[in-house]
A protein has these predicted regions:
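Generic beta-strand/beta-sheet core signal
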Residues: 50, 70-72, 98-100
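Substrate-binding/catalytic subdomain of NAD(P)-dependent oxidoreductase enzymes
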Residues: 55-83, 93-94
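Active-site/ligand-binding loops adjacent to catalytic centers
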Residues: 1-69, 112-138
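Catalytic phosphate/nucleotide-handling subdomain of diverse soluble enzymes
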Residues: 77-138
């Protein structure tokens, strides 16, 4: 997806032999990929690359505020950080961060670090996410 975004194409740029801790997003030619790229262009969605270390940092930071997500879901946090720093996302903008995959889907990540389990207050979800984005990467 990122390669298509960077190349300004309207179709997926297939790849193979790619390994990442974020296994859920390693398919080299995802089903529906061309449609996603079409929507991304139509609605001016942004895309950003993240390193393996950045994925793990994001997963850990999300876990610290009560969101145990798989590495693939955690990629969005650091990507948003980079887009803010590059001023591609302006202060006060509405940003949607998809956290769809539970950390229980990919327990291999524990070989990189240990996470502590904590309770999260559902009424504070929006505040937690905004505080995370505003304060965690100062």
């Amino acid at each position: 997806m990122l390669a298509a975004h960077e190349a300004s194409t309207s179709i997926v740029v297939p790849f193979s032999n790619f390994h990442t801790v974020a296994e859920a997003i390693t398919t080299g030619n995802p089903m529906g990929g061309d449609e996603i790229i079409h929507k991304a262009k139509k609605y001016n969605w942004l895309a950003e690359s993240v390193t393996e270390e950045e994925i793990l940092v994001s997963q850990r930071k999300l876990g610290e505020v009560g969101y145990f997500v798989e590495p693939a879901s955690a990629t969005s946090l650091y990507a948003i950080k980079k887009l803010f720093k590059a001023e591609k996302i302006k202060e006060g903008s509405t940003v949607v961060m998809m956290l769809t995959g539970t950390g229980l889907k990919d327990l291999d990540v524990f070989k990189y670090y240990h996470l502590n389990v904590m309770e999260s207050n559902i009424e504070k979800v929006e505040d937690d996410v905004w505080n995370l984005l505003k304060n965690i990467y100062n």
